[in-house]
Amino acid sequence: MNLVGSYAHHHHHHHSHPPHPMLHEPFLFGPASRCHQERPYFQSWLLSPADAAPDFPAGGPPPTTAVAAAAYGPDARPSQSPGRLEALGSRLPKRKGSGPKKERRRTESINSAFAELRECIPNVPADTKLSKIKTLRLATSYIAYLMDVLAKDAQAGDPEAFKAELKKTDGGRESKRKRELPQQPESFPPASGPGEKRIKGRTGWPQQVWALELNQ
């Protein structure tokens, strides 16, 4: 109360002088000191959420979106998932498997054709295994024999006259025909006249044809 009274008395006598700063000290600096003491509390209460939060650019995605984008990358797509790639990889061997199947069918077809060709060659023992080269050579020899028969208009004879030559020789067609000469000529049927009916079945090499071949 003395301060208030002195303030009023001083103010009444000295109007031209400014008030003494000490008179206003309790009012000016008292609240300031309290605010100074309470400032850390308010700063911690107001600024702690902002300080604790990580710095993100303005308008950026939330933390969960940013973490997901960093984990998968900008080019991550559903079509590039591991399961999708494994499914695509499992289809590649299937495409490559069509080649061996086609080759196997082609080989089986060729083997079947050679088996049918071997059956058409006469006088080949059943237990004889012919290679493809021998099969082609015997078939060529038999075709040449049939062409000679048709060219000379000879009578059909015994198919035993044609012998499958299984040994490898260096001679020509004439030497083969001489070696294929039957040991018993009397076993062949006699030559028939022009008006007689020809014997059905596979054509053979008649005795007259052999004689003509040997006399040449």
UniProtKB/Swiss-Prot annotation:
Disordered as annotated region, ranges: 1-20, 53-109, 165-203
Residues modified as Phosphoserine: S109
Compartments, as annotated in UniProt: Nucleus, Nucleoplasm; Nucleus, Nucleolus
Tissue-wise expression: Smooth muscle cells of the gut and adrenal tissue.
Ranges of residues in domain bHLH: 94-146
Bias type Basic and acidic residues, positions: 165-174
GO biological process, one term: cardiac septum morphogenesis
Biased composition (Basic residues): 8-18, 92-104
Protein's UniProt keywords contain Phosphoprotein: yes
Single annotated GO MF: protein homodimerization activity
SMART domains xrefs: HLH
Annotated phenotype, changing T107A: Remains exclusively in the nucleolus
Record note on modification: Phosphorylation by PLK4 disrupts the interaction with MDFIC and leads to translocation into the nucleoplasm, allowing dimerization and transcription factor activity.
Any single GO CC term annotated in Swiss-Prot or TrEMBL for this entry: nucleolus
Segments of skewed composition (Low complexity): 65-78
Keyword set, alphabetical order: Activator, Developmental protein, DNA-binding, Nucleus, Phosphoprotein, Transcription, Transcription regulation
Sequence positions bearing Phosphothreonine: T107
Stated role: Transcription factor that plays an essential role in both trophoblast giant cell differentiation and in cardiac morphogenesis. Binds the DNA sequence 5'-NRTCTG-3' (non-canonical E-box). Acts as a transcriptional repressor of SOX15. In the adult, could be required for ongoing expression of cardiac-specific genes.
Quaternary organization: Efficient DNA binding requires dimerization with another bHLH protein. Forms homodimers and heterodimers with TCF3 gene products E12 and E47, HAND2 and HEY1, HEY2 and HEYL (hairy-related transcription factors). Interacts with MDFIC. Interacts with SOX15; the interaction enhances HAND1-induced differentiation of trophoblast giant cells.
Name listed for the protein in its UniProt record: Heart- and neural crest derivatives-expressed protein 1
